[in-house]
Regions:
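Phosphate/oxyanion-binding active-site loops and adjacent basic polyanion-contact surfaces
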Residues: 1-3, 41-49, 180-184
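Glycine-rich adenosine-cofactor-binding loop
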Residues: 1-30
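Short amphipathic alpha-helical segments
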Residues: 6-10, 35-36, 97-100, 126
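Glycine-rich phosphate-binding loop and adjoining beta1-alpha1-beta2 segment
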Residues: 20-61
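Hydrophobic/aromatic anchor residues within beta-strands of the central parallel beta-sheet
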Residues: 65-67, 112
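Conserved SAM/SAH-binding loop
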Residues: 69-75
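A short, aliphatic-rich alpha-helical micro-motif
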Residues: 78-80
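E1/E1-like adenylate-forming module used to activate ubiquitin-like modifiers
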Residues: 83-191
């Protein structure tokens, strides 16, 4: 989701006119990502944030784009300096940590937009939190080991991972690129 979302935000003006579009990711682009990621083979084995920033600087040279290659959890204070924080990682532990920081620093912390896919891309969701009088991410999933209060999918939806024997990545989530692009579009609209 993140690569498509970064592109759409840039095309919408994020990082222009004195603004900055910072991208953070601790993962590298792998072969199993190519079917559902903005970036292609020339960016394999590169940090996703750095590669995406380089790609966007080529496509949209007027933007100010920065990259953080590594876990944002090592430098969460950088989030406090943003106008909007967007978590499109799909990493629930990171989402909970960002939410906890945001709630603890209300009302001065920027709004946080959480975006993700459920059920092998069957549903996309986007939720923005920031107002102290309204729900936070944990309000939607009070039992962190359980199911969310408001499910996007029916309870009998089966989640599967498959073996991707064609490349070095042992597991992949089988959903098409259109799902990541749709989730990014939803998040861009909410942002």
């Amino acid at each position: 989701i993140g690569g498509f979302l970064a592109q759409q935000l840039g095309q919408s003006g994020a990082g222009a006119g004195g603004g900055k579009l910072p991208l953070a990711d601790n993962d590298t682009l792998k072969g199993a990502n190519l079917g559902r990621h903005l970036l292609g083979a020339p960016y394999l084995d590169r940090n996703k944030a750095e590669a995406c920033a380089d790609f966007l600087k080529e496509q949209l040279p007027h933007l100010e784009i920065a990259s953080i290659a590594g876990s944002i959890q090592a430098n969460m204070e950088v989030l406090s300096r943003q106008d909007l924080v967007i978590d499109a990682t799909g990493d629930e532990a990171l989402s909970i940590a960002i939410n906890e920081l945001a709630v603890g620093k209300r009302p001065t912390f920027p709004p946080v937009l959480f975006s993700g896919l459920e059920g092998n891309g069957a549903a996309a969701g986007a939720f923005i939190a920031g107002d102290a009088d309204l729900a936070c991410l944990k309000c939607l999933k009070t039992d962190l080991a359980g199911i969310p209060r408001f499910r996007l999918l029916k309870g009998d939806t089966e989640l599967k991972t498959g073996r991707n024997l064609a490349c070095g990545d042992a597991h992949f989530i089988p959903f098409p690129v259109s799902r990541a692009a749709a989730a990014a579009s939803l998040a861009c609209d909410v942002a």
